[in-house]
Amino acid sequence: MATATTAAKKTSGRLLTPPFRVSFPSVFEKASYNGGTERYSLTGLFYPKQFTEADKAKWDAIKKKLGEVCLEFFKKDIKTMKEDRSFKIPFHKGNEKDYQGYGDPDMVFFSMANSKRRPQILDTKMQPITPENSEEFYAGCWARATVNCFAFDKIGKGVSIGLGNLQKLSDDESFEGFTSAEDDFGDDPVEGFDGGDDDLSDLD
C-alpha cells in the first residue's frame, strides 16, 4: 500500500498521443505555476469527435494505462478512487476554463509535465525545433507527444501524465492573438504608391 510520503511512481512505457492544439507551452525554459516546482510543460487540447480510428486507439491506450497505474499504486481502480473528490485526474472538459482556445464542451484537455529534461521537438520533416527557432512552436499550433502515465500521493493523490518528446504537426492561429506582418498585408498588395508629397502639417 502506498504511504503518504511515497514519491510519484512513473511507468516506464511511452505512449503516443493523438494530435492536439498546444496551449501554455513552457518547453524551451522551465516555468513555475502557483509557486510549484519549475518544470517543462504544456497543455494539450484534444477533440475526440474528430479522432480517426488510429487516434481513438491512442487515446484509449492512455486511459487504459492511467487505470493500470492507479490500480497498481493504490490497489483500487480509478472509479473507486474518484469517490474521494480530492483525487486528481488529468482529463478536463474544455468548458471548465475560460482561456483562449477553450470553452468547447466537446474538447478535452490535459497538462503534461517533465521537471527534469527539456523535451526534444521535431517538425514533420524530422528537423529539430530548438530555442534558436522557438517561434516555430507556439500556443495554437498542432502537435503530438510521447507521454507516460504515473500515480502520486506525495502532495495529494491522483494519476497524471508525464511529457516525453514532441512533434509539431501543423500551424494554426496563435492563441496569443498575434499575426505576422505578411499575414496582415500580404492579401492587399500596394500598387503604384510612391510615398506621396502631400503637405501633412495640418495633422500635427
Regions of interest found by a model, annotated:
Residues 1-109:
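OB-fold ssDNA-binding interfaces and closely related basic DNA-contact patches used
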Residues 1-16, 173-204:
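Acidic, gly/ser/pro-rich intrinsically disordered tails
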Residues 39-41, 107, 142-146, 158, ...:
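Broad gene-expression machinery/nucleic-acid interaction feature
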Residues 43-45, 111-113, 146-148, 165-167:
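Residue-level recognition of well-ordered beta-strand positions that form the cores
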Residues 46-50, 149-151, 170:
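Beta-strand elements of well-folded, non-transmembrane domains
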Residues 98-127:
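Catalytic core of the SET domain in histone-lysine N-methyltransferases
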Residues 122-142, 150-160:
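Exposed beta-sheet edge/beta-hairpin loop segments within beta-rich domains
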Residues 153-173:
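OB-fold/S1-family single-stranded nucleic acid-binding modules
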